[in-house]
Amino acid sequence: MQKRLHYSSLEINRRAEELIQHSANRYRITVQIANRAKQRRGLEASEDLDDLPLKPVIRAIIEMSDEVAQPELLADS
């Protein structure tokens, strides 16, 4: 059984705002978050949804906010 990770809604909001502030285009960063979440959901489709520690969108926000220090990772591929 996986350990559940808990982030407060305030922490998620802070990270999302941080992403938006560091992005030149609010729409583009929103689409990038959605695309990463969609990819993550596809990778985890075979797993039981009750065992997932975080929803894909929240995980995408957390991962991308951690990558803000490396802006080249946020660039379009």
From Swiss-Prot:
In cyanobacteria the RNAP catalytic core is composed of 2 alpha, 1 beta, 1 beta', 1 gamma and 1 omega subunit. When a sigma factor is associated with the core the holoenzyme is formed, which can initiate transcription. It is an enzyme of class 2 (transferase). InterPro entries: DNA-dir_RNA_pol_omega, Pol_omega/Rpo6/RPB6, RPB6/omega-like_sf. It comes from the Bacteria. Belongs to the RNA polymerase subunit omega family. Keywords: DNA-directed RNA polymerase, Nucleotidyltransferase, Transcription, Transferase. GO terms for molecular function: DNA binding; DNA-directed RNA polymerase activity. Promotes RNA polymerase assembly. Latches the N- and C-terminal regions of the beta' subunit thereby facilitating its interaction with the beta and alpha subunits. It catalyses: RNA(n) + a ribonucleoside 5'-triphosphate = RNA(n+1) + diphosphate. Pfam families: RNA_pol_Rpb6. GO terms for cellular component: DNA-directed RNA polymerase complex. The gene is rpoZ. It comes from Thermosynechococcus vestitus (strain NIES-2133 / IAM M-273 / BP-1). The keyword Membrane does not apply. Its EC number is 2.7.7.6. This is DNA-directed RNA polymerase subunit omega. GO terms for biological process: DNA-templated transcription.
